[in-house]
C-alpha cells in the first residue's frame, strides 16, 4: 500500500518542527510515534473506499469525519489528505506561538472524540458476500495480502513496545493481541495458498478473498477504536475489558457471518474447488505459500480427541516443512497438496457439522465427505517422516568436527540418568546406538592420526557419515526428551539410524579387509596439476633473500645441505627457486643440475625419470625399468659429483622420504633446493640450514612488480602512479595477487578512470582469481582440519585472534577429537601448528618463554575463502545489517551464524532452531552501550545452541539457563549475582562473563555442580554462600583456568583450591589482613602453571608463601614484600620460567637479595614500577636467564654485575630508569659481546639516554633527544667493537 513514502516524509517533518521547540525529549518522540501509528491505521481504511461493506459498517464514515475535522480550520482539504494532515499536525503539535503540550493535547482530543462517537454505532459487516460487487483490481489476492500485511504491521507495533512511558504502550498481558496477529498471518497464508493453487479465478475464490478482507478490516477497526489505552486515555475500557473484547471477537469468527452464509462453508467451497483441479505445484519454498499452515489454523482450538492425532501430525508436518525447499522432497508436491486439502476439508466440515449437531462424530464426517480418515492418515504419516528426516538431513552442514561423537556419547550417558522416564520406551534402541558409536571410536582416531593413508577419501567419507548420524541421533534424542516427536515416529526413526550405522560399519570393515598388497600400493599417478617451472622468469623483489640463499648454496657446510623454502600459495617460491637454479654464478659451481616437480599427486617413476633426464640425458628405454633400478641408477650418477637438485612443490614428508635416498652425501658441498607450502615438510627436509619462511612483499617490491608486469621495460606514467601505488597496496603484499591484477591492467586503457575502476573492484577480482590456489590447499587438508580452518571465517578482517579463545571455541564446537592420555587443548594446539605449517594461518605473537603461539590472524584472501567456502558447505553464514530474513528460505541451515548486530539476531531467531553457534562480531570492536539486551526469549528458539559468543560486546539482561546443550558462553552482564539456575547449563565448559562496572559478583554454590566446566572467567567473584560451598563435596576436576576469584581470607583461598585440584592457570585477587602461622605456605594445585596474583589494596604484604611445584609463570602485583619472602617462595618454585613483579615495594631499606641457586629455571625477569634501590644477586643465581626487562625502576642504583657472566642472557631492556642503570646495562652488553662473543645479545634503552644497539643487524637507533657528543662517543665505541 502506497503510504510508506508519505509517512516517511511526515516523520521527517515532525522531526524538523520538534527541533524548533525549546525542549527536545523522549516525550516529543513518543508523541510523534503516536500520531504516525494513528495515521497508518487510518490509511488502511482509506484504501477500502470501493467496497460496499466498508461503507455499510461505517468504516468510511470515520475517514470522512477526519476530512470534516480538517475543514474546521478554514482550509479546504487537499486531494492528498496526508499532505494536509502533515501540515496541520506540524502546526498544532509544534507551533512556536503555543506550548507544545497544548497542540498535542488538542489533536489527541480530536482523534479520541471521533473514535468514541464512531465506536458507539460500529458493528460487524452484515452485507451478503454475494452482493459485494467490486472491481477485479481491488479484489485480487495481492491487494488482500497487502492489506493484511499493513494491519499486521500496525499490530506488531503495539506488541513490541514495552516502555510504559510510550503513548502506544498496552498494559497487561498481550496474549490476545498476539493471538489476533497469528490469526491474521494464517489468514494471509490461506489467501496465498489459494492464490498459488488456483488456475483460473472462480466465484468461490472471489467470495473467499472478500471474506478475508472483511475479517482483516474488522480486526483493524476493533483494535484501532480501543487501543492504545494510554495514548487515548481510555477511561471507559480497561485493559482487561479490551482483552475480553478481543477474545469475544475470536469466538465470533467461527460463527455465521449472517444467516445462510457460514465462514466454514466459504472455506469448504474454496478447498473443494481446489481439490478438483490440483495444479502442478510451483517449485518454491513451501513456507512462501503457507502450504500447511491452513489445517493447523487456530480453529483447531476446540478439536475433539478424535481429531487430536491428525492435529499432531499436521503440526509436525508444518514445523519441519518450513525449512525444506520443495526441490528436496522425494515425492510429488501434488501429493502433499492433496493431503493438506483433505485435512482442511475434514477440519472445516467438522466445525460446520458440529454447529448443526452437537453429537456429530468422525464417522458422520467421513460419510458426509465420502472418504475414510483412518485410511487417509496413513499417507500423512509416511509424508511426515519423509519431510522430517529430509528437512533435518538436508540442513546439516557438509563439514563436521570429528570430536562430535565424543560429545554425543557423554550426553547419551547423562541423558539416560537425567531423563530416564522419557527414555523408557526407547532405552534399548538408544543403548544399541551408544554401543555402535563406541565401536566406531577407534576408526575415527585413525582418520585423525593417519590422514594420508591409502584410503583417505573413503575414510573421510565414512567419518562424515558417522558425524552426520551423530547429529541426527542428538536431534531424535532431544525430541524424545521434549516430546517433540510422537513415540510412534521415534521408534521407526531410531531403527533406521541403527541400520544406517550398520551399513557404515560394513563399508569400514570392507576397507579394512582389502588385500594387504593393495594396502601397500601408493596411489601416485601422474598429476595434471604438475607443472614445469619457467626457467628464465625474471624475479622482482626478494633481493636480500636471493643473496642469502646464493651464499648458502655456494658456501656453508661441506656436507650435503637441503635448503627448504616454504610459504603460502602465491608468494613466489617456485619462481625464487628457479631464479637460483638458473643463476649462472650458482650453476657454474656444480657438476650436475637436475630438477623435478613433485606436486600433490605424483608418480615416483616419473620423478626419477625427470631427474635422470637432466643428469644424463633422455633415454626412452629407462621407462621400462622398475623403480628400484631407476633409483639406484640416479644415486650412482650423482655419487662422485657435486650436484644441485631442485625438488619443487613437495606436499608431505613421504614424498621427500622417497627421494632423499637417491641423493648421496660425500662432503662435496652438494645442495638441494626444496619448495613446499608446509613448514613441517621444510623442517623435516632441512639438514644444516634452517628452513626459509618466504616473507610477503614490502611496499616497494609490490609496486615494482606491478609496474614491471604492466609496462615491461617502460616506466609508469606519472598520472597513473598514485592509483597504481594504491592498487599495489590493496593486493595485500601477495605476489600472485599482484600478477593477477597486472594482467587485468595490461588489457585496459592506460587511463586514470580505468585504473580507478579496478581499484574500486579490486577485492572481488583478486579474491575470485586467487580462490583456485587457496582451494587446492584446502582440498588436501585432512578431514579434521577443514572445520578448524573454515572456522576462521567467523572472525573479522585483520582481527588478531587470541589462541586461547580460539582453542576453547574449537573444543566447544567439537572440532577436536579426543585421544587417550592427551589434553584436548594440547591436541588443538597441534591442529593449529599444522595449519600454520601449511601457511594457511599467520602467527602474530609467540610466547617468549616456550615459543608457543599466542595470537594469529588470516590473510584477507584466505579469510574471504573461508567465509565463501563455509557458506557453500552450510557451515557458517554471516548475517549483516539490513539483510532480509526472507533469505533464510533460500539458504539451508548453517551450523554457525555470525551476526554484526543484535537486531539481526532478533529477526532471524525464529528460523534458527537447528543452529549450533551464534557469534556476534562488532565491527567497532568495542562494547555496545546499555541498557541490557533482553535475550532469553530470543534464545529459546536456538534449542541446539552450543556456542554463544557475544564477545563482551552486548550486555544481556539474564543468563540463558534453558540451553542445556550450551558449551561456551561469553557475554557482558550488569547483575551483581549469578542465578542458581546456572547449573541447568550442565554441558557448559567455558563461561566468560564481564561486568559493566568494577564490582564483586556473587557466585552461587550450584556452580560446583557444573562438573564439565573447563574455563571459568568472571571478574572479582566470590561465593554467594561460603558455608554451602564448604558443605558441598563436589569438585571441579575438569576446571583448568580460573579468574578472577576474590579472597578476603586465606581460608577462602584454601577452600577454592581444594575444589579445583587440576587448575593450570589462576588469576586471583586477595585481601588478607593477617596470616595465621599454620597457613605459612599456601599449596596450589600441583598442575598449576600460570599464577597471577593481585592485591585489592595496594602495597599490603602477601600473607602466604606460594607453593606450586610445576609453576612456570608468576606475576605479583601491588604488593609489599622482602627478600626473605621471595627467597622462601623461590624454594617452592623450582620450575619457574617467567617472573613479573609490578608495583612492588621492598622492605629492608628497599633491598632485594637473591641467593645462590634461586630461580634455577627462570628465563624471563620483568620488573616494573618497583620501589627498589639496591639489588644484590649471588653469582650462581638466575643461571638460565635469557631476558631482563626493567621499566620505571627509578630508584634502582644499578644492575648487578653478575649478569655479565650469565651465558644464556640474550636481551636487556631498560625504560625510564636512572643513568647508572643504563650504564650498568651497557657494561653488561660490552662484556657479553666482546668477552663472551655473544653476538645474539641485544640491548634496548628507552627513555633517558635512549640509544638502542642491535649487534646482529649492526644498527644503532636513537629513540629520544640525546646529546650529540654522547651519541658520537657511543658510535665510536661500537665501531671499535665491530658492532656498527
UniProtKB/Swiss-Prot annotation:
<feature type="repeat" description="LRR 2">
    <location>
        <begin position="985"/>
        <end position="1010"/>
    </location>
</feature>
<comment type="function">
    <text>Confers resistance to late blight (Phytophthora infestans) races carrying the avirulence gene Avr1. Resistance proteins guard the plant against pathogens that contain an appropriate avirulence protein via an indirect interaction with this avirulence protein. That triggers a defense system including the hypersensitive response, which restricts the pathogen growth.</text>
</comment>
<dbReference type="GO" id="GO:0009626">
    <property type="term" value="P:plant-type hypersensitive response"/>
</dbReference>
<comment type="similarity">
    <text>Belongs to the disease resistance NB-LRR family.</text>
</comment>
<dbReference type="InterPro" id="IPR036388">
    <property type="entry name" value="WH-like_DNA-bd_sf"/>
</dbReference>
<keyword id="KW-0611">Plant defense</keyword>
<feature type="domain" description="NB-ARC">
    <location>
        <begin position="534"/>
        <end position="821"/>
    </location>
</feature>
<keyword id="KW-0175">Coiled coil</keyword>
<keyword id="KW-0381">Hypersensitive response</keyword>
<feature type="repeat" description="LRR 6">
    <location>
        <begin position="1159"/>
        <end position="1181"/>
    </location>
</feature>
<dbReference type="Pfam" id="PF23598">
    <property type="entry name" value="LRR_14"/>
</dbReference>
<dbReference type="InterPro" id="IPR038005">
    <property type="entry name" value="RX-like_CC"/>
</dbReference>
<dbReference type="InterPro" id="IPR006121">
    <property type="entry name" value="HMA_dom"/>
</dbReference>
<feature type="binding site">
    <location>
        <begin position="567"/>
        <end position="574"/>
    </location>
    <ligand>
        <name>ATP</name>
    </ligand>
</feature>
<feature type="repeat" description="LRR 4">
    <location>
        <begin position="1085"/>
        <end position="1107"/>
    </location>
</feature>
<keyword id="KW-0963">Cytoplasm</keyword>
<dbReference type="InterPro" id="IPR027417">
    <property type="entry name" value="P-loop_NTPase"/>
</dbReference>
<keyword id="KW-0433">Leucine-rich repeat</keyword>
<keyword id="KW-0547">Nucleotide-binding</keyword>
<dbReference type="InterPro" id="IPR032675">
    <property type="entry name" value="LRR_dom_sf"/>
</dbReference>
<dbReference type="Pfam" id="PF00931">
    <property type="entry name" value="NB-ARC"/>
</dbReference>
<keyword id="KW-0677">Repeat</keyword>
<dbReference type="Pfam" id="PF23559">
    <property type="entry name" value="WH_DRP"/>
</dbReference>
<dbReference type="GO" id="GO:0016020">
    <property type="term" value="C:membrane"/>
</dbReference>
<dbReference type="GO" id="GO:0005524">
    <property type="term" value="F:ATP binding"/>
</dbReference>
<dbReference type="InterPro" id="IPR055414">
    <property type="entry name" value="LRR_R13L4/SHOC2-like"/>
</dbReference>
<feature type="repeat" description="LRR 5">
    <location>
        <begin position="1108"/>
        <end position="1135"/>
    </location>
</feature>
<dbReference type="GO" id="GO:0046872">
    <property type="term" value="F:metal ion binding"/>
</dbReference>
<dbReference type="GO" id="GO:0043531">
    <property type="term" value="F:ADP binding"/>
</dbReference>
<feature type="repeat" description="LRR 1">
    <location>
        <begin position="942"/>
        <end position="966"/>
    </location>
</feature>
<dbReference type="InterPro" id="IPR044974">
    <property type="entry name" value="Disease_R_plants"/>
</dbReference>
<feature type="coiled-coil region">
    <location>
        <begin position="533"/>
        <end position="555"/>
    </location>
</feature>
<dbReference type="Pfam" id="PF12061">
    <property type="entry name" value="NB-LRR"/>
</dbReference>
<protein>
    <recommendedName>
        <fullName>Putative late blight resistance protein homolog R1B-16</fullName>
    </recommendedName>
</protein>
<dbReference type="InterPro" id="IPR042197">
    <property type="entry name" value="Apaf_helical"/>
</dbReference>
<dbReference type="InterPro" id="IPR021929">
    <property type="entry name" value="R1A-like_N"/>
</dbReference>
<feature type="repeat" description="LRR 3">
    <location>
        <begin position="1013"/>
        <end position="1036"/>
    </location>
</feature>
<feature type="repeat" description="LRR 7">
    <location>
        <begin position="1182"/>
        <end position="1206"/>
    </location>
</feature>
<keyword id="KW-0067">ATP-binding</keyword>
<dbReference type="GO" id="GO:0005737">
    <property type="term" value="C:cytoplasm"/>
</dbReference>
<keyword id="KW-0472">Membrane</keyword>
<feature type="repeat" description="LRR 8">
    <location>
        <begin position="1219"/>
        <end position="1243"/>
    </location>
</feature>
Amino acid at each position: 500500500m502506497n503510504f510508506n513514502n508519505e509517512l516517511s516524509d511526515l516523520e521527517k517533518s515532525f522531526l524538523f518542527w520538534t527541533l524548533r521547540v525549546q525542549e527536545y525529549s523522549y516525550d516529543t518522540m513518543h508523541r510523534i510515534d503516536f500520531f504516525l501509528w494513528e495515521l497508518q491505521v487510518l490509511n488502511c481504511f482509506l484504501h477500502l473506499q470501493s467496497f460496499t461493506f466498508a461503507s455499510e459498517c461505517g468504516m468510511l464514515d470515520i475517514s470522512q469525519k477526519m476530512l470534516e475535522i480538517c475543514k474546521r480550520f478554514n482550509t479546504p482539504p487537499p486531494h492528498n489528505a496526508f499532505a494536509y494532515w502533515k501540515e496541520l499536525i506540524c502546526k498544532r503539535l509544534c507551533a512556536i506561538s503555543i506550548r507544545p503540550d497544548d497542540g498535542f493535547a488538542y489533536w489527541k482530543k480530536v482523534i479520541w472524540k471521533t473514535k468514541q462517537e464512531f465506536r458507539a454505532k460500529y458493528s460487524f459487516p452484515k452485507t451478503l458476500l454475494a452482493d459485494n460487487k467490486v472491481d477485479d483490481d481491488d479484489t485480487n489476492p495481492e491487494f488482500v495480502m497487502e492489506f493484511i500485511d499493513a494491519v499486521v504491521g500496525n499490530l506488531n507495533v503495539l506488541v513490541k513496545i514495552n516502555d510504559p512511558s510510550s503513548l502506544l504502550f498496552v498494559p497487561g498481558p498481550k496474549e490476545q493481541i498476539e493471538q489476533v496477529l497469528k490469526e491474521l498471518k494464517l489468514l494471509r497464508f490461506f489467501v496465498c495458498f489459494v492464490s498459488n493453487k488456483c488456475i483460473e479465478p472462480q466465484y468461490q475464490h472471489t467470495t473467499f478473498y472478500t471474506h478475508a478482507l472483511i475479517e482483516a478490516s474488522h480486526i483493524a477497526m476493533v483494535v484501532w477504536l480501543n487501543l492504545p489505552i494510554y495514548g487515548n486515555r481510555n477511561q471507559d475500557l480497561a485493559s482487561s475489558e479490551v482483552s475480553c473484547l478481543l477474545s469475544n471477537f475470536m469466538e465470533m469468527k467461527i460463527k455465521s457471518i449472517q444467516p445462510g452464509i457460514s465462514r466454514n462453508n466459504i472455506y469448504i467451497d474454496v478447498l473443494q474447488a481446489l481439490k478438483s483441479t490440483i495444479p502442478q505445484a510451483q517449485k518454491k519454498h513451501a513456507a512462501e505459500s503457507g502450504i500447511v499452515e491452513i489445517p493447523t489454523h487456530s480453529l483447531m482450538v476446540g478439536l475433539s480427541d478424535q481429531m487430536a492425532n491428525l492435529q499432531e501430525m499436521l503440526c509436525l508436518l508444518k514445523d519441519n516443512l518450513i525449512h525444506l525447499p520443495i526441490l528436496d522432497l522425494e515425492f510429488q508436491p501434488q501429493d502433499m497438496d492433496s493431503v493438506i486439502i483433505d485435512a482442511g476439508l475434514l477440519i472445516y466440515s467438522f466445525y460446520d457439522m458440529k454447529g448443526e449437531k452437537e453429537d456429530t462424530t468422525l464417522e458422520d464426517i467421513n460419510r458426509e465427505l465420502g472418504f475414510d480418515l483412518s485410511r487417509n492418515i496413513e499417507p500423512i504419516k509416511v509424508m511426515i517422516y519423509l519431510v522430517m528426516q529430509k528437512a533435518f538431513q538436508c540442513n546439516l552442514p557438509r563439514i563436521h568436527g570429528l570430536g562430535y561423537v565424543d560429545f554425543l556419547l557423554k550426553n547419551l550417558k547423562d541423558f539416560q540418568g537425567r531423563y530416564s522416564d522419557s527414555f523408557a520406551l526407547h532405552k534399548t534402541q538408544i543403548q544399541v546406538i551408544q554401543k555402535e558409536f563406541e565401536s566406531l571410536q577407534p576408526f575415527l582416531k585413525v582418520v585423525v592420526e593417519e590422514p594420508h593413508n591409502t584410503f583417505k577419501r573413503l575414510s573421510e567419507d565414512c567419518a562424515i557419515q558417522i558425524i552426520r548420524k551423530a547429529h541426527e541421533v542428538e536431534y531424535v534424542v532431544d525430541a524424545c526428551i521434549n516430546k517433540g516427536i510422537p513415540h510412534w515416529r521415534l521408534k521407526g526413526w531410531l531403527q533406521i539410524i541403527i541400520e544406517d550405522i550398520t551399513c557404515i560399519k560394513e563399508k569400514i570393515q570392507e576397507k579394512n579387509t582389502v588385500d594387504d598388497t593393495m594396502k601397500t600400493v601408493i596411489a601416485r599417478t601422474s598429476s595434471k596439476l604438475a607443472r614445469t617451472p619457467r626457467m628464465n622468469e625474471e624475479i622482482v623483489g626478494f633481493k636480500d633473500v636471493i643473496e642469502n640463499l646464493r651464499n648458502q648454496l655456494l658456501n656453508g657446510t661441506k656436507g650435503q645441505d637441503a635448503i627448504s623454502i616454504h610459504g603460502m600459495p602465491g608468494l613466489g617460491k617456485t619462481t625464487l627457486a628457479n631464479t637460483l637454479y638458473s643463476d649462472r654464478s650458482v650453476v657454474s659451481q656444480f657438476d650436475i643440475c637436475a630438477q623435478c616437480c613433485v606436486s600433490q599427486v605424483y608418480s615416483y617413476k616419473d620423478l626419477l625419470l625427470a631427474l635422470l633426464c637432466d643428469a644424463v640425458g633422455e633415454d626412452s628405454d629407462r621407462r621400462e625399468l622398475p623403480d628400484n633400478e631407476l633409483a639406484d641408477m640416479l644415486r650412482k650418477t650423482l655419487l662422485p659429483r657435486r650436484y644441485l637438485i631442485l625438488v619443487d612443490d613437495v606436499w608431505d614428508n613421504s614424498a621427500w622420504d622417497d627421494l632423499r635416498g637417491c641423493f648421496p652425501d660425500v662432503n662435496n658441498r652438494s645442495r638441494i633446493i626444496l619448495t613446499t607450502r608446509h613448514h613441517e615438510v621444510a623442517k623435516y627436509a632441512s639438514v644444516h640450514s634452517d628452513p626459509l619462511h618466504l616473507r610477503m612483499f614490502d611496499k616497494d617490491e609490490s609496486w615494482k612488480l606491478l609496474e614491471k608486469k604492466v609496462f615491461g621495460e617502460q616506466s609508469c606514467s606519472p598520472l597513473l602512479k598514485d592509483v597504481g601505488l594504491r592498487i599495489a597496496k590493496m593486493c595485500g603484499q601477495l605476489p600472485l595477487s599482484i600478477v593477477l591484477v597486472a594482467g587485468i591492467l595490461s588489457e585496459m586503457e592506460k587511463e586514470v578512470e580505468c585504473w580507478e575502476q579496478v581499484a574500486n573492484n579490486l577485492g572481488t577480482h583478486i579474491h575470485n582469481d586467487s580462490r583456485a590456489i587457496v582451494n587446492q590447499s584446502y582440498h588436501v587438508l585432512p578431514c579434521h582440519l577443514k572445520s578448524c580452518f573454515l572456522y576462521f571465517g567467523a572472525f573479522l578482517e585483520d582481527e588478531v585472534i587470541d589462541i586461547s579463545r580460539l582453542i576453547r571455541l574449537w573444543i566447544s564446537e567439537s572440532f577436536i577429537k579426543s585421544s587417550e592420555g592427551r589434553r584436548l587443548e594440547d591436541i588443538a594446539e597441534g591442529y593449529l601448528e599444522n595449519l600454520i605449517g601449511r601457511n594457511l594461518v599467520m602467527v602474530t605473537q609467540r610466547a617468549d618463554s616456550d615459543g608457543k603461539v599466542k595470537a594469529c590472524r588470516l590473510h584477507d584472501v584466505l579469510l574471504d575463502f573461508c567465509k565463501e567456502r563455509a557458506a557453500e558447505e552450510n557451515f557458517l553464514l554471516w548475517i549483516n545489517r539490513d539483510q532480509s530474513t526472507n533469505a533464510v528460505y533460500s539458504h539451508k541451515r548453517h551450523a554457525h551464524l555470525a551476526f554484526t548486530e543484535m537486531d539481526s539476531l532478533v529477526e532471524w531467531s525464529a528460523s534458527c532452531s537447528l543452529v549450533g553457534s551464534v557469534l556476534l562480531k562488532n565491527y567497532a570492536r568495542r562494547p555496545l552501550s546499555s541498557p541490557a539486551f533482553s535475550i532469553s526469549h530470543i534464545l529459546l528458539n536456538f534449542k541446539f545452541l552450543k556456542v554463544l559468543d557475544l564477545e563482551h560486546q552486548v550486555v544481556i539482561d539474564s543468563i540463558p539457563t534453558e540451553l542445556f546443550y550450551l558449551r561456551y558462553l561469553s557475554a557482558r552482564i550488569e547483575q551483581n549475582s549469578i542465578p542458581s539456575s546456572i547449573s541447568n547449563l550442565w554441558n557448559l565448559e567455558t563461561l566468560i562473563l564481564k561486568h559493566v562496572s568494577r564490582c564483586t559478583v556473587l557466585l552461587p554454590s550450584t556452580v560446583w555442580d557444573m562438573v564439565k566446566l573447563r574455563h571459568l572467567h568472571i571478574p572479582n567473584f566470590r561465593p554467594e554462600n561460603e558455608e554451602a560451598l564448604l558443605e558441598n563435596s563436589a569438585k571441579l576436576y575438569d576446571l583448568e583456568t580460573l579468574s578472577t576469584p576474590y579472597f578476603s581470607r586465606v581460608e577462602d583461598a584454601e577452600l577454592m583450591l581444594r575444589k579445583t585440584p587440576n587448575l593450570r592457570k589462576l588469576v586471583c585477587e586477595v585481601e588478607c589482613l593477617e596470616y595465621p602461622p599454620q597457613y605459612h605456605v599456601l599449596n596450589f594445585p600441583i598442575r598449576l602453571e600460570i599464577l597471577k596474583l593481585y592485591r585489592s589494596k595496594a602495597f599490603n604484604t602477601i600473607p602466604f608463601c606460594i607453593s606450586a611445584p610445576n609453576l612456570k609463570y608468576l606475576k605479583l602485583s601491588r604488593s609489599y614484600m622482602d627478600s626473605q619472602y621471595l627467597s622462601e617462595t623461590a624454594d617452592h618454585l623450582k620450575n619457574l620460567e617467567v617472573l613479573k613483579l609490578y608495583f612492588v615495594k621492598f622492605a629492608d631499606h628497599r633491598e632485594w637479595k637473591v641467593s645462590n641457586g634461586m630461580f634455577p629455571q627462570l628465563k624471563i625477569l620483568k620488573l616494573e614500577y618497583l620501589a627498589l634501590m639496591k639489588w644484590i644477586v649471588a653469582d650462581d643465581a638466575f643461571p638460565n636467564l635469557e631476558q631482563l626487562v626493567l621499566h620505571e625502576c627509578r630508584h634502582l642504583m644499578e644492575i648487578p654485575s653478575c649478569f655479565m657472566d650469565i651465558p644464556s642472557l640474550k636481551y636487556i631492556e631498560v625504560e625510564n630508569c636512572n643513568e647508572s642503570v643504563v650504564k650498568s646495562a651497557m657494561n653488561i652488553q660490552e662484556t657479553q659481546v666482546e668477552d663472551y662473543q655473544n653476538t645474539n645479545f641485544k640491548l634496548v634503552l628507552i627513555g633517558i639516554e635512549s640509544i638502542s644497539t642491535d649487534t646482529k643487524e649492526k644498527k644503532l637507533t636513537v629513540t629520544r633527544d640525546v646529546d650529540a657528543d654522547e651519541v658520537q662517543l657511543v658510535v665510536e665505541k661500537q665501531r671499535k667493537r665491530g658492532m656498527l
